[in-house]
């Protein structure tokens, strides 16, 4: 299984970049993992939020094949404990999924078309985080899931 971590635009703050790189490197010890950056839209001054979501959605959907699994990191998604997240990752690995795309939406979220295409929606918290901050939170939780699955001493109950 190859995990694609899809981001809209580059990570702005150096402390977030460093954290994401740290956990990305660790994740690669367990599974094939790559970061896919969808470039930020240019000339959005004359676009409303819905038009921005639509254009970002079109860029995302153009990267997917019908067989790809699309998981949206979304405040309306299912919430897991870290142990439940690990169990879900194991379930997906057991299903022999080839490509799974975990997507952090842009600042305004996802278009209706992206929601319709999604196989699953995952929420990391009831709280709202910036689309920049969620990048670090997600890769840490993904790393934690793999340490749980491998009985390594990172996670403590």
Regions found by a protein language model. Name each.
Residues 6, 36, 71, 120-122:
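Hydrophobic/aromatic beta-strand patches that form the interior of the parallel beta-sheet core
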Residues 9-14, 76-77, 128:
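Short histidine/acidic/glycine/proline-rich micro-motifs that form metal-
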Residues 2, 98-102:
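Loop/turn-to-beta-strand initiation segments
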Residues 1-27:
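N-terminal beta1-alpha1 ligand-phosphate binding loop
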Residues 112-156:
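Structured adenosyl-cofactor binding patch, chiefly the S-adenosyl-L-methionine
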